[in-house]
Amino acid sequence: MKAAPTLSKQLIFQYEHQTADFNMDELVQSAARVIAPLWPIETFAARHPWMGLEEQTFEQTARQLKQQLHVDIYPKSSIFRSAKQRGEIDETILEKKLINWLDSHQPGMQRETAEAFCKAALKLDEIPGQLLRSRQVKKLAKQAARGTIDGRKTSFIKPLSVFAGQKSAHLLDHHVIKWCKLFLDESQSAWRLPHREKGFYSAWRQLVEHDPALSRAERQRLNGWPEEPRDAMKKALRAFDISNADVQAYLEAHLLSLPGWAGMMLWRSQQSQDEEELLLEYLAVRLSMEWMLVEPYLPLPKPNPEKEMQLVPLIASWLHWGGLTPEEWLELSAAEQKARLTLARRFDDITRRRLWLEAWEQTYAAEVRKLITANKPAAADKSETVLAQFAFCIDVRSEPFRRALEKSGPFETYGTAGFFNMAIETCELGTKHSHSSLPVILKPQHRVEETAEELPFKSYQEHKKAAASLSSAFKTMKQNLLAGMLLPEVSGPWLSLQMAARSLVPRAAGQAFRNARKTWLKKPQTKLSLDRTETSEAGIPVGFTEEEKAAYARQALKMMGITDRFAPLVVICGHGSRSTNNPYASALDCGACGGASGAFNARVLAALCNLPSVRERLRSDGIFIPDDTVFAAAEHITTLDELHWLYVPELPAKAQQAFDRINSVLPDVSRTVGAERLEELPQLGYQNPRNEVERFAEDWSEIRPEWGLARNASFIIGTRRLTRGADLEGRAFLHSYDWRNDEDGSILSGIISGPGTVAQWINLQYYASTVAPHYYGSGNKATQTVTAGLGVMQGNASDLLAGLPWQSVMRSDDEIYHAPLRLLIVIEAPDDDIERLLDRDHSFRQKAENGWIHLASINPEGKWKNWTNTINE
């Protein structure tokens, strides 16, 4: 296994002068592995917090974060106890895992003694604080420290501001946050940071000497400070006496101090060559201000590394779980004491909770296995042929809707990535703003614009400008000192009426405002710029060539598995959500479309598949779409459990019959899915499920309009035969795949590298926000502040919060809703295909090998195989 990144490197502070130069750019790039890019909240995209650390195991990362940051990424004991009470953890599996652990660790004592101790410790009850504070236990620890077990002689590097006192560390974060907000502001403030165009460090350098928040002495310290960020970093590091070998670890510690703001800087540096040094400049500002704050205290006293293991909790564990008395402990020989201390150290809290988590995950995997292997789909009615086929996003919220839709009639459903393999940038009618409607790990290759006839478009544009002018005038008055005083008088009556309506009758008010806006704007019928016309300002071609049209259609159909037996009507279903007063609205939309609705992509694909020229080219690839098959586009509104039609061309008789049948069953499907979903949402009771669902979407005081992707736990890649009719409880990403149509394995590789990666990121973001909400979550929605148009903070001086609010993962203050399980990926394919995938895809193999995902497969004979254990053998 490869060596772990330097986050895991244990270091002693070495107060020595630099003896050699180093490449600062390379060190910053390497240090950036400990953080993840953070996208603006308007295009909220799931982020895997530990994506740069997958070269090491999940447990190694957990230990390092616990020791360096006091951040625990294993679920706490109370979460496991609750899961056990709900029957989600099989104790038999837990016991087997303990036996396996003991078999692989020679305890150096009688097996019965070791097993009894570990079983008692595995109950997860806390050692009483009185015992840990006991003088007698401390005396025993002092005696045992004389050579029974090696002590820790190292410590993790931390910013020097930490050792200068909590005040210095807090002030450093406070100042850095302030400058980040000023530099990154996206049009929220009326005042723009001077010299911003020169870069973050240069702007800071020219303005910091005038910062009224600094004392005169602090400002004077920065007189003559280097103009170049690399020189500033080197000067600060030399002043701190950080050795060359420790520089990267020191930079990592600073990045981890504010991972949200650092993550935003990292993301910005990856988007434009103009800002490619932004993360380096961020570190230069941070180190410069750290030097300014700690310079009076230099040289700081050398931190005292731990010279011995903290034996108190180890001895206390044997008194508590091992049933020993202090007298019995003293009767043990030195070798016996050492063996017991070694076992207690190895079977520590992290090891115990690792076993609990793995038992929980294996219990869930066993349930999925039982559901799949025992699933016997109802035989299709031979008298009723398939009327329509639906392609849904793999999103876990699609699973209940697909299940209900299939039960309602002769329909087939398929799962694929919600951007439908369309690497496009979209531009809606009447706006210059474009959106990259694809996963954030990809870049758009084509631009598609909405167009309309000149006269209706002109009217629409005028109405839209009028609405925008009103909004702009309101914002201008709000930010102007004198006009702001008049604003309450001018806007008070209207805003009071709006507040009363939205508070007292949110459902009716929301619908009324929506209808009024729609009536006022009068958006005309639109077309899509499918034909290649020009190149956009960003250098992206607008529209497609004939070959590109066919290539996109071919790729999408193959990825979703619809290449033959076409129904009269094929519906491409994007998905989006609807909520009010919700800064996390984009988190409820399609993650595969960059935190937006997949409606635009669905329209593009459906339109391409209806083109005769595209169908003609597809025939040469063996994909024969019947002349009477029509593609339509719809949007699955997850907050309302509704399907809204977006694009329905002229329909021949059979397709019209299918369309009518779909419309007749959709109300019942919506009611069924809505009632199922409402049972999981905290609410005070309701009489009409449909009205309650609409209220959740329109109520601006609603902190939880829907659960989003909470409780996601598995990603199943295979034919619908595996899961059709099975109730997966909205916890599974479902991607259609038939290994028989994938001879070279390219389709499976594409699924794993694309949708599989996005699903893993989603899974680990929900996981992190649940187990460590104070560090990886974003706190309470009710107390959040939208900051600089970029993201949210708690108050006005916190880190930029990268994760999900507790309302997205918690049922109440004391009860979690999301089960923090690492993603289980199940692939329907022969063993040889899985081995080929693992041999080709080193990154995917590494994820499974190091415990970032779990991998299982089902072969053509229906046999289940757990690959995670096989890989590690």
UniProtKB/Swiss-Prot annotation:
Give the subcellular location.
Cell membrane
Q: Which residues of this UniProt protein bind Zn(2+)?
A: 393, 395, 575, 590
Cofactor entry: Zn(2+)
Main site of residence?
membrane
Q: How does it sit in the membrane?
A: Peripheral membrane protein
Q: Which UniProt keywords apply?
A: Cell membrane, Membrane, Metal-binding, Transport, Zinc
Pfam short name (any one) = DabA
What GO annotations for molecular function exist for this entry?
zinc ion binding
The question of whether Ribonucleoprotein is a record keyword is answered with no
InterPro entries in UniProt: DabA
Q: Name one GO cellular component term.
A: plasma membrane
> What job does the chain carry out?
Part of an energy-coupled inorganic carbon pump.
Entry similarity comment: Belongs to the inorganic carbon transporter (TC 9.A.2) DabA family.
Subunit field text: Forms a complex with DabB.
What is the designated name of this protein? Probable inorganic carbon transporter subunit DabA
Q: Which organism is it from?
A: Bacillus licheniformis (strain ATCC 14580 / DSM 13 / JCM 2505 / CCUG 7422 / NBRC 12200 / NCIMB 9375 / NCTC 10341 / NRRL NRS-1264 / Gibson 46)
Q: Which gene encodes it?
A: dabA
